[in-house]
Regions:
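Beta-propeller folds
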Residues: 1-346
Length: 346
């Protein structure tokens, strides 16, 4: 045991993170280097008696498709490598780099119309592989929707507009510019108007684009951290020898209640609507009523149970949202914050 703890390589450097190649007859895996924490990628053909050989770094983007998604006829696959999108031909195994940016493109997928889609931050794009045109589908803004030019509300403000012609003129000019901008966006279809506002101090917990690229399901949560300022632990082993206060997870007793709000966005109509949890069975059930009643009885008190909406959110899993093939229906995995109920909803 002492030898293993002192030198983990002595115990062995077993293959890690293996996955099948596109031909279903090749296996890729990673292996730790001797004496350091770096991992190398290896490939082994099952048709050959030759030992596995290392994949060169210059070719990692070609074989980094373990999480690739195929198109409807399964002739091509799409995946991301180091923030860029690649499309590979399933027959010739030739790959094409679609994006070459410093941004991080993720959630790459094929759409039912033959285009591809991907996400950069909270912005979703559609990319036509034939013409090269990129279309912004949705821009999720964690801010309040701009109110535009407002009329004076207070008595003092109204008097200012009456008595000072310059202020009234500025107000009129601002309204004219705002109206012209609105007319331009409405009448000129080359201008993108895909911003959707979800209020400040919020964050996108999960967002899923439909295979047709015409719908978006978004889960919004508060941006407030689950940790408090006091959730720290001293770290005595640091680079400079100075004791550091490391942020750690919240104490169990201080764990705040957590919930998410679901929104459905019709990208064709440009409409956003909140989804209600009230159709879920037991969404307002007092699931801990027996425990609370027992605790109250211990203190000589009587507990009166009452129905109250529970804190519900998407399950913390890889794919809590699943669309059908044409994007006309969607299924969700939901759970309550109290860990007493889960729902599979459509």
């Amino acid at each position: 045991l002492e030898q293993i703890m002192a030198d983990p390589d002595w115990f062995g450097r077993a293959p890690e993170s293996w996955y099948w190649g596109d031909d279903s007859n090749t296996v890729f895996y990673k292996q730790k280097q001797l004496g350091n924490p770096l991992r190398d990628l290896f490939v082994k053909s099952l048709d050959s008696d030759k030992a596995a050989h290392q994949v060169g770094l210059a070719k990692h983007h070609i074989v980094a498709d373990s999480d690739a998604k195929k198109n409807s006829v399964r002739s091509h696959e799409i995946y991301s490598f180091k923030g860029n999108v690649f499309v590979k031909n399933g027959v010739s195994q030739s790959g094409k780099q679609i994006t070459y940016t410093s941004a991080t493109e993720s959630n790459a997928m094929f759409l039912t119309n033959g285009n591809i889609a991907y996400r950069v931050g909270n912005v979703f794009y559609s990319h036509n592989l034939t013409t090269g045109q990129v279309v912004e589908l949705a821009n999720l803004q964690m801010a309040e929707k701009p109110k535009g030019v407002e009329e004076p509300a207070s008595y003092l403000a109204k008097e200012q507009h009456k008595l000072i012609s310059y202020i009234a003129l500025q107000q009129r000019n601002s309204k004219l510019k705002e109206q012209q901008k609105a007319d331009l966006e409405k009448q000129n279809d080359t201008i993108t108007t895909t911003k959707y506002y979800f209020g400040k101090d919020n964050r996108v917990s999960h967002a899923s684009l439909s295979p047709a690229g015409d719908k978006l399901l978004v889960s919004i949560a508060t941006a407030k951290s689950s940790r408090d300022k006091s959730d720290i632990m001293p770290n005595y082993i640091t680079k400079d020898g100075v004791i550091a206060a490391e942020k750690v997870r919240a104490r169990v007793a201080n764990n705040r209640q957590y919930k998410e709000t679901l929104f459905f966005i019709d990208l064709n109509k440009g409409e956003k609507s909140a989804l209600s949890y009230q159709t879920l069975p037991d969404f307002d059930k007092d699931v801990l009523a027996d425990v609370k009643r027992e605790n109250h009885a211990r203190e000589g008190k009587e507990y009166k149970s009452k129905k109250q909406a529970r804190n519900i959110h998407l399950m913390q899993m890889w794919f809590p949202v699943k669309w059908n093939s044409d994007g006309s229906q969607v299924a969700l995995m939901l759970e309550a914050w109290d860990n007493k109920t889960r729902w599979l909803a459509t």
